[in-house]
Amino acid sequence: MTSPIPTPTKFDDKFGSISKSYKNFRPTYNDELYSIIDSHCDEKRDLAIDIGAGSGQATVRLAKYFKKVIGFEPSQGQIENAEKTDNVEYRLSAAEKIDLPSGSVDLITVAQAAHWFNLPVFYEESKRLLRENGSLIIWSYGLMKITNNNDAQVVHEKHYYETIGDQYWAPERKYIDDEYVDIKPSFENTTRKTISLPKSMSINDMIGYYSSWSGYAAFIKAGNKDVLPEIKETLLKAYKTTDGDSKLIDVNFPVYMILSKKE
């Protein structure tokens, strides 16, 4: 994918129409990721904010570590389907202008969303929001690999690169395909880490995950025939079953983390 990456000028809701699929089928993050976040933050933990919170998969996990967590998300559909817990709230907001006082935030997280932002503006807003020694932690998971069935992996790659491909993936997807190397927060104290996120899912869950892709939503919006029933049949054959819940697909997601601290 070699399309130039534009600077977003207005919010284009790519996930509102698929917010339920996003909540139900997107991977949740493992304990290793939150342990890294925990280790990167200092002892002052009054307020964490999760920007581009989506349906709150990461937002609610931060509640264990901080007195209060606010998820900021520009899609009303995502907020309506967001995970709830006592010390978490959600607010409708773009990433580039957050209605909080300067120096009031201990941690800013961005999970699987920074590639949609106007990054130079977001970096400056992050600096404004964070207190001294506050942390900005950004991460994204890349294209998963199916590890227990080569035929299924071929189907998976064909769906990503050919059926959806450049014509339906937004240009911003290139940030993820390039392992977030072009996400460069303007903080001097910045490190990078890549971890693995292994998962097992049923064939039905895999089809649900495909339905949560923004590229799939664009594919359907363009008037194309839904290919997911055909992909399901191909996966059933690959795993030699007729039951979409009887066999597990083992997958691994690479997770690219960027850890910054305001000095």
Swiss-Prot record:
GO terms for biological process: methylation. The keyword Glycoprotein does not apply. InterPro entries: Diverse_substrate_MTase (IPR051052), Methyltransf_11 (IPR013216), SAM-dependent_MTases_sf (IPR029063). Its EC number is 2.1.1.-. GO terms for molecular function: S-adenosylmethionine-dependent methyltransferase activity. GO terms for cellular component: phagocytic vesicle. Keywords: Methyltransferase, S-adenosyl-L-methionine, Transferase. Belongs to the methyltransferase superfamily. This is Putative methyltransferase DDB_G0268948. It comes from Dictyostelium discoideum (Social amoeba).
